[in-house]
Amino acid sequence: MERLELDEKCTPKLECMISGLPSVTSVGMASLLPHRELQVDEKLNVTVDGQSCGDLASRDKILKAQNENNVALSFDDLINANQERLRELLQGRNIVYIYHNQVDARGDKPASENEVFKACEEAIEEIHRLVHRLTMYLSAPKFFITADHGFLYKRDKLQEYDKVSYDREICTCTNKRFLITTQRTKD
């Protein structure tokens, strides 16, 4: 945050919001799209007003249904684009969602999950550079930067008392970080 505050063209403001549970990308990304209803199946596939939203093309379609001048793009497409390409992609747009995936890419893999805080720092720096480029090349006046979900992180190895024992046969969804069941938990 301090680094962003040093940028005279930046007025950073940090606020928290309520997140959907479980705290996973598929639920969080869907929550940030315009919608009347979200539905989640037992495999954590999420639909927004009945439409799939599991990839960039689907999210773009959902945004365009609200306004044909809305668009969903990937961070990589924009960060590597020259000024002409940026204008082509963004000129005349109403709302632009830019998806950046570095934190998930590193945090979801056991070999690199201990790098998640470093990935967050790098993501902030990369997004700040992109915002600077867009401001310079396109005179884009306002940016809202969000995260699709937070993360629960424990630096130390989990102890047995940190774990919950549950019959996986009655779970509708299991994951290394959570499980979903229709059964009540025991205290």
Give a label for each model feature.
Residues 1-187:
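Feature captures the catalytic ectodomains and active-site-proximal regions of enzymes
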